Amino acid sequence: MSQIHPTALISPSATIDETATIGPYCIVGDEVTIGAHTVLHRHVVVTRLTRIGEHNQFYQFSSIGEDPQDLKYAGERTWLEIGDHNTIREACSLHRGTEQDGGLTKIGSHNLLMVNTHVAHDCLIGDHNVLANNVGVAGHVTIGNHIIVGGNSGIHQFCTIDDYSLVGGATLVLKDVAAFTMVSGNPAKAHGLNVEGMRRKGWSKDSIDVLRQAYRVVFRSGLTTVQALEVLKQDLLPKEQKIEFLIDSLQKSRRGVVR
Protein backbone atom coordinates (compact mmCIF):
# COMPACT_ATOMS: atom_id res chain seq x y z
CA MET A 1 0.00 0.00 0.00
CA SER A 2 1.21 3.55 -0.76
CA GLN A 3 2.73 5.46 2.14
CA ILE A 4 0.37 8.43 2.31
CA HIS A 5 0.58 10.81 5.25
CA PRO A 6 -2.80 11.42 6.93
CA THR A 7 -2.56 15.17 6.28
CA ALA A 8 -2.18 14.70 2.50
CA LEU A 9 -5.17 15.42 0.24
CA ILE A 10 -5.60 12.91 -2.60
CA SER A 11 -8.15 13.12 -5.40
CA PRO A 12 -10.26 9.99 -5.90
CA SER A 13 -9.24 10.03 -9.58
CA ALA A 14 -5.49 10.01 -8.82
CA THR A 15 -3.50 6.80 -9.34
CA ILE A 16 -0.60 6.29 -6.93
CA ASP A 17 1.71 3.28 -7.05
CA GLU A 18 1.77 1.21 -3.89
CA THR A 19 5.50 1.89 -3.44
CA ALA A 20 5.20 5.69 -3.75
CA THR A 21 5.42 8.01 -0.74
CA ILE A 22 3.21 11.07 -0.25
CA GLY A 23 4.42 13.24 2.63
CA PRO A 24 2.73 15.68 5.01
CA TYR A 25 0.42 18.35 3.58
CA CYS A 26 0.87 17.29 -0.03
CA ILE A 27 -1.99 17.70 -2.51
CA VAL A 28 -2.47 15.30 -5.42
CA GLY A 29 -5.20 16.44 -7.79
CA ASP A 30 -7.47 14.99 -10.44
CA GLU A 31 -6.14 12.49 -13.00
CA VAL A 32 -2.62 12.50 -11.60
CA THR A 33 -0.54 9.32 -11.95
CA ILE A 34 2.47 8.75 -9.68
CA GLY A 35 4.81 5.85 -10.42
CA ALA A 36 6.78 3.40 -8.33
CA HIS A 37 9.14 4.65 -5.60
CA THR A 38 8.43 8.31 -6.33
CA VAL A 39 8.48 10.53 -3.24
CA LEU A 40 6.60 13.76 -2.58
CA HIS A 41 8.41 14.86 0.56
CA ARG A 42 6.11 17.52 2.08
CA HIS A 43 4.00 20.50 1.00
CA VAL A 44 4.13 19.43 -2.67
CA VAL A 45 1.19 20.26 -4.94
CA VAL A 46 0.51 18.20 -8.08
CA THR A 47 -2.49 20.08 -9.44
CA ARG A 48 -4.00 17.81 -12.11
CA LEU A 49 -3.56 16.08 -15.48
CA THR A 50 0.01 15.03 -14.70
CA ARG A 51 1.80 11.73 -15.30
CA ILE A 52 4.87 11.10 -13.14
CA GLY A 53 7.14 8.09 -13.60
CA GLU A 54 9.29 6.11 -11.20
CA HIS A 55 11.98 7.00 -8.64
CA ASN A 56 11.38 10.76 -8.70
CA GLN A 57 11.92 13.09 -5.74
CA PHE A 58 9.84 16.25 -5.23
CA TYR A 59 10.77 18.70 -2.49
CA GLN A 60 8.66 21.15 -0.51
CA PHE A 61 6.63 23.93 -2.11
CA SER A 62 7.14 22.65 -5.65
CA SER A 63 4.09 23.29 -7.86
CA ILE A 64 3.63 20.57 -10.46
CA GLY A 65 1.10 20.44 -13.29
CA GLU A 66 -0.45 23.86 -12.77
CA ASP A 67 -2.34 25.66 -15.54
CA PRO A 68 -0.13 27.30 -18.20
CA GLN A 69 0.58 31.03 -17.86
CA ASP A 70 -0.74 31.84 -21.32
CA LEU A 71 -3.50 34.32 -22.10
CA LYS A 72 -4.85 31.95 -24.77
CA TYR A 73 -5.44 29.18 -22.23
CA ALA A 74 -9.15 28.64 -21.65
CA GLY A 75 -9.26 25.56 -19.45
CA GLU A 76 -8.44 22.91 -22.07
CA ARG A 77 -7.32 19.44 -20.96
CA THR A 78 -3.56 19.65 -21.36
CA TRP A 79 -0.84 17.58 -19.75
CA LEU A 80 2.50 17.46 -17.98
CA GLU A 81 4.59 14.29 -18.28
CA ILE A 82 7.66 13.58 -16.13
CA GLY A 83 9.88 10.54 -16.65
CA ASP A 84 11.98 8.61 -14.15
CA HIS A 85 14.80 9.36 -11.68
CA ASN A 86 14.31 13.13 -11.63
CA THR A 87 15.01 15.38 -8.65
CA ILE A 88 12.78 18.45 -8.38
CA ARG A 89 13.99 20.71 -5.59
CA GLU A 90 12.21 23.31 -3.48
CA ALA A 91 9.78 25.81 -5.04
CA CYS A 92 10.08 24.57 -8.62
CA SER A 93 7.11 25.23 -10.89
CA LEU A 94 6.37 22.96 -13.86
CA HIS A 95 3.34 23.90 -15.95
CA ARG A 96 1.17 21.91 -18.33
CA GLY A 97 1.07 22.54 -22.08
CA THR A 98 -1.33 24.53 -24.24
CA GLU A 99 -3.68 23.23 -26.89
CA GLN A 100 -2.02 25.47 -29.49
CA ASP A 101 1.27 23.53 -29.24
CA GLY A 102 0.22 19.94 -28.78
CA GLY A 103 -1.08 20.21 -25.23
CA LEU A 104 1.99 18.73 -23.53
CA THR A 105 4.93 19.81 -21.41
CA LYS A 106 7.38 16.91 -21.16
CA ILE A 107 10.38 16.32 -18.91
CA GLY A 108 12.51 13.23 -19.50
CA SER A 109 14.57 11.25 -17.02
CA HIS A 110 17.63 11.71 -14.78
CA ASN A 111 17.26 15.48 -14.56
CA LEU A 112 18.09 17.75 -11.62
CA LEU A 113 16.02 20.91 -11.34
CA MET A 114 17.42 23.02 -8.52
CA VAL A 115 15.60 25.45 -6.24
CA ASN A 116 13.04 27.80 -7.82
CA THR A 117 13.42 26.58 -11.39
CA HIS A 118 10.47 27.38 -13.64
CA VAL A 119 9.57 25.29 -16.71
CA ALA A 120 6.76 26.93 -18.67
CA HIS A 121 4.06 25.49 -20.90
CA ASP A 122 4.90 23.31 -23.91
CA CYS A 123 8.57 22.85 -23.04
CA LEU A 124 10.32 19.63 -24.01
CA ILE A 125 13.25 18.66 -21.78
CA GLY A 126 15.32 15.55 -22.45
CA ASP A 127 17.51 13.46 -20.15
CA HIS A 128 20.53 13.96 -17.88
CA ASN A 129 20.22 17.74 -17.58
CA VAL A 130 20.97 20.11 -14.70
CA LEU A 131 19.03 23.36 -14.36
CA ALA A 132 20.55 25.33 -11.50
CA ASN A 133 18.83 27.64 -9.01
CA ASN A 134 16.39 30.25 -10.35
CA VAL A 135 16.56 29.20 -13.99
CA GLY A 136 13.57 30.46 -15.97
CA VAL A 137 12.58 28.45 -19.05
CA ALA A 138 9.94 30.26 -21.10
CA GLY A 139 7.22 28.57 -23.13
CA HIS A 140 7.85 26.28 -26.10
CA VAL A 141 11.57 25.81 -25.30
CA THR A 142 13.35 22.57 -26.20
CA ILE A 143 16.27 21.41 -24.04
CA GLY A 144 18.11 18.33 -25.27
CA ASN A 145 20.30 15.93 -23.28
CA HIS A 146 23.39 16.22 -21.07
CA ILE A 147 23.07 20.01 -20.69
CA ILE A 148 23.90 22.30 -17.78
CA VAL A 149 22.13 25.65 -17.40
CA GLY A 150 23.74 27.92 -14.81
CA GLY A 151 21.81 29.65 -12.05
CA ASN A 152 19.70 32.77 -12.62
CA SER A 153 19.66 32.21 -16.39
CA GLY A 154 16.67 32.95 -18.59
CA ILE A 155 15.78 31.17 -21.84
CA HIS A 156 13.54 32.99 -24.32
CA GLN A 157 10.47 31.23 -25.66
CA PHE A 158 10.86 28.94 -28.69
CA CYS A 159 14.65 28.60 -28.21
CA THR A 160 16.44 25.25 -28.47
CA ILE A 161 19.36 24.29 -26.22
CA ASP A 162 21.11 21.38 -27.90
CA ASP A 163 22.94 18.33 -26.56
CA TYR A 164 26.12 18.55 -24.48
CA SER A 165 26.04 22.34 -24.28
CA LEU A 166 26.67 24.57 -21.27
CA VAL A 167 24.87 27.82 -20.44
CA GLY A 168 26.78 29.94 -17.93
CA GLY A 169 25.20 31.54 -14.88
CA ALA A 170 23.04 34.67 -15.23
CA THR A 171 22.85 34.24 -19.02
CA LEU A 172 20.05 35.53 -21.24
CA VAL A 173 19.51 33.10 -24.12
CA LEU A 174 17.68 34.73 -27.04
CA LYS A 175 18.75 32.35 -29.83
CA ASP A 176 19.36 28.62 -30.18
CA VAL A 177 22.42 27.12 -28.49
CA ALA A 178 24.28 24.71 -30.78
CA ALA A 179 25.41 21.29 -29.57
CA PHE A 180 28.70 21.15 -27.63
CA THR A 181 29.00 24.92 -27.19
CA MET A 182 29.48 27.07 -24.08
CA VAL A 183 27.55 30.31 -23.99
CA SER A 184 27.25 33.08 -21.43
CA GLY A 185 26.41 36.75 -21.07
CA ASN A 186 23.48 39.10 -21.57
CA PRO A 187 22.71 38.50 -24.35
CA ALA A 188 24.45 35.13 -24.67
CA LYS A 189 27.59 34.77 -26.76
CA ALA A 190 29.53 31.62 -27.67
CA HIS A 191 32.81 31.15 -25.80
CA GLY A 192 34.07 27.79 -27.01
CA LEU A 193 33.40 24.10 -26.63
CA ASN A 194 32.12 22.39 -23.51
CA VAL A 195 35.37 20.43 -23.31
CA GLU A 196 35.15 19.63 -19.61
CA GLY A 197 31.71 18.14 -20.14
CA MET A 198 33.09 15.96 -22.94
CA ARG A 199 35.95 14.76 -20.76
CA ARG A 200 33.54 13.86 -17.98
CA LYS A 201 31.66 11.70 -20.48
CA GLY A 202 34.91 9.89 -21.28
CA TRP A 203 35.26 11.13 -24.84
CA SER A 204 38.67 10.60 -26.42
CA LYS A 205 41.15 13.39 -27.10
CA ASP A 206 40.89 12.63 -30.82
CA SER A 207 37.12 13.15 -30.79
CA ILE A 208 37.45 16.39 -28.88
CA ASP A 209 40.15 17.66 -31.25
CA VAL A 210 37.90 17.10 -34.27
CA LEU A 211 35.06 18.90 -32.50
CA ARG A 212 37.41 21.81 -31.83
CA GLN A 213 38.05 22.00 -35.57
CA ALA A 214 34.31 21.96 -36.20
CA TYR A 215 33.78 24.79 -33.72
CA ARG A 216 36.38 26.94 -35.46
CA VAL A 217 34.76 26.27 -38.85
CA VAL A 218 31.31 27.32 -37.65
CA PHE A 219 32.08 30.13 -35.23
CA ARG A 220 35.49 31.58 -36.10
CA SER A 221 36.15 31.09 -39.82
CA GLY A 222 33.88 33.79 -41.20
CA LEU A 223 32.04 31.25 -43.37
CA THR A 224 28.30 31.47 -43.81
CA THR A 225 26.24 28.74 -42.17
CA VAL A 226 25.69 27.06 -45.54
CA GLN A 227 29.42 27.09 -46.28
CA ALA A 228 30.29 25.84 -42.80
CA LEU A 229 27.83 22.96 -43.13
CA GLU A 230 29.51 21.84 -46.35
CA VAL A 231 32.90 21.73 -44.62
CA LEU A 232 31.47 19.81 -41.67
CA LYS A 233 29.80 17.22 -43.90
CA GLN A 234 32.63 16.73 -46.37
CA ASP A 235 35.76 17.12 -44.26
CA LEU A 236 34.97 16.45 -40.59
CA LEU A 237 31.96 14.12 -40.40
CA PRO A 238 33.97 11.21 -41.88
CA LYS A 239 36.46 11.64 -39.01
CA GLU A 240 33.95 11.93 -36.15
CA GLN A 241 30.29 10.90 -36.15
CA LYS A 242 29.47 13.20 -33.22
CA ILE A 243 29.70 16.07 -35.72
CA GLU A 244 26.13 15.02 -36.64
CA PHE A 245 24.89 16.71 -33.45
CA LEU A 246 26.36 20.04 -34.55
CA ILE A 247 25.12 19.67 -38.12
CA ASP A 248 21.63 18.95 -36.82
CA SER A 249 21.75 22.04 -34.56
CA LEU A 250 22.59 24.32 -37.46
CA GLN A 251 20.13 22.79 -39.91
CA LYS A 252 17.08 22.85 -37.67
CA SER A 253 17.62 26.25 -36.04
CA ARG A 254 14.77 28.68 -36.68
CA ARG A 255 16.06 31.54 -34.54
CA GLY A 256 19.73 31.35 -35.52
CA VAL A 257 22.40 30.07 -33.15
CA VAL A 258 24.24 31.99 -30.46
CA ARG A 259 27.61 33.14 -31.84
Swiss-Prot record:
Catalytic activity: a (3R)-hydroxyacyl-[ACP] + UDP-N-acetyl-alpha-D-glucosamine = a UDP-3-O-[(3R)-3-hydroxyacyl]-N-acetyl-alpha-D-glucosamine + holo-[ACP]
Gene Ontology biological-process annotations: lipid A biosynthetic process
InterPro entries: Acetyltransf_C, Acetyltransf_C_sf, Hexapep, Hexapep_transf_CS, Lipid_A_LpxA, Trimer_LpxA-like_sf
Main localization category: cytoplasm
Listed pathway(s): Glycolipid biosynthesis; lipid IV(A) biosynthesis; lipid IV(A) from (3R)-3-hydroxytetradecanoyl-[acyl-carrier-protein] and UDP-N-acetyl-alpha-D-glucosamine: step 1/6
Keywords assigned: Acyltransferase, Cytoplasm, Lipid A biosynthesis, Lipid biosynthesis, Lipid metabolism, Repeat, Transferase
GO function terms (MF aspect): acyl-[acyl-carrier-protein]-UDP-N-acetylglucosamine O-acyltransferase activity
Enzyme Commission number(s) of this protein: 2.3.1.129
Origin superkingdom: Bacteria
UniProt-annotated location(s): Cytoplasm
GO cellular component: cytoplasm; membrane
Similarity remark: Belongs to the transferase hexapeptide repeat family. LpxA subfamily.
Quaternary structure annotation from Swiss-Prot or TrEMBL: Homotrimer.
UniProt cross-references to HAMAP family, sorted A to Z: LpxA (MF_00387)
Summary of the function given for this chain in its UniProt record: Involved in the biosynthesis of lipid A, a phosphorylated glycolipid that anchors the lipopolysaccharide to the outer membrane of the cell.
Protein name, entry field: Acyl-[acyl-carrier-protein]--UDP-N-acetylglucosamine O-acyltransferase
Gene designation: lpxA
